[in-house]
Amino acid sequence: MSLEPFKHSEALTFGVELELQLVNRHDYDLAPFAPDLLRALKGAQHAGDIKPEISPSMIEISTGICHTYQQALDELTTMRDLMQAASRSLNIGISGGGTHPFQQWADRIISDSPRYQYISELYGYLAKQFTVFGQHVHIGCPSADESLFLLHAIGRYVPHFVALAASSPYVQGVDTGFASARLNSVAAFPMSGRAPFLLTWDAFTAYFEKMRNTGVIESMKDFYWDIRPKPEFGTIEVRVMDTPLTVERACDIAAYIQMLARYLLLSRPFMPQEDDYLVYTFNRFQACRFGLEGEYVHPNELTRRPIAEHILSICDALVPHAEALGSMQALANIRALAENRNGDAEWLRQVDADARTQRETVRQACERWAA
């Protein structure tokens, strides 16, 4: 299909999507409970959406179009509480986190939908290994061209988003040494990575048509980029975050992205350029591997500092934007997280060290999500 026209949306509105783990309460392994949970939730009144995902051991919740941090927090909290109430009668545990600590990918089932079955046929075992859990944030853009400016400008801050949300240190029972191992699964897909450096919608449309004519892609859904335009919504979609362990942290990160977007669109502190991507992969790796302790190389100044320090360095510039958006609490939470460097990956490792069993780690992660 041809590329859709870029739909009008209200600038700086946002939406949040969270992919969640469903586990049984016996051994806390992933379990295919999404159909049962969705049946139990049928008719429940809430904003946003609750829907199945690529595996029936996963479920996605998403807000509606939000203007404020508090609105997103209220919507996600309501859906969380509804799901917790329904899950108790079904003996289901629900958890955040970018990976399940000890699930075996070969045990996974692919959901019975045409798109997911197509992905399974095309990518083979990679589809089952894609049972990982991410947070996506959509940001409304004033125009198609502005969406591409914002996509590339905010790309400098991808290491911030990865490090702040990192919650996937374990894969198949092994401590990977990474703060966010989830993104290694995404990197296996051929259309992953970063979007091409194009700053006009006409140029992007021409690129899309060339790619479509090769037969490699059919729609924007076939691009697994870290940040991609979503013309049907009039947004860009930031896709690099693990699902945090709490609704509150997910909303803090979404609000941080919103205030960064406002800063970049209104203040124009720099113009994106191709050379911004010289250190993109290095910075992204540092965030995945070391989280907030990772190194950030500035693409123009060529200076090096911890990612946590780079986050703190931008926080002062974001104050007027956080005030305008009603997100001062979120900014304070982000600042505290960067100062203390006590992210979700660190929490999981500490619980695992104390509990000495990953089943107990998952149980406590379920309790943390429900709190």
UniProtKB/Swiss-Prot annotation:
InterPro entries, per this entry? GCL_type2/YbdK_subfam, GCS2, Gln_synth/guanido_kin_cat_dom, YbdK
Q: What are its GO biological-process terms?
A: modified amino acid biosynthetic process
Which catalytic reaction applies to this protein?
L-cysteine + L-glutamate + ATP = gamma-L-glutamyl-L-cysteine + ADP + phosphate + H(+)
Q: What is its EC number?
A: 6.3.2.2
Q: Which UniProt keywords apply?
A: ATP-binding, Ligase, Nucleotide-binding
Give the source's domain of life in one word: Bacteria
- Provide a Gene Ontology MF annotation, just one: glutamate-cysteine ligase activity
Task performed by this protein = ATP-dependent carboxylate-amine ligase which exhibits weak glutamate--cysteine ligase activity.
UniProt family annotation? Belongs to the glutamate--cysteine ligase type 2 family. YbdK subfamily.
According to UniProt, the name of this protein is Putative glutamate--cysteine ligase 2
Which species is this UniProt entry from?
Cupriavidus pinatubonensis (strain JMP 134 / LMG 1197) (Cupriavidus necator (strain JMP 134))
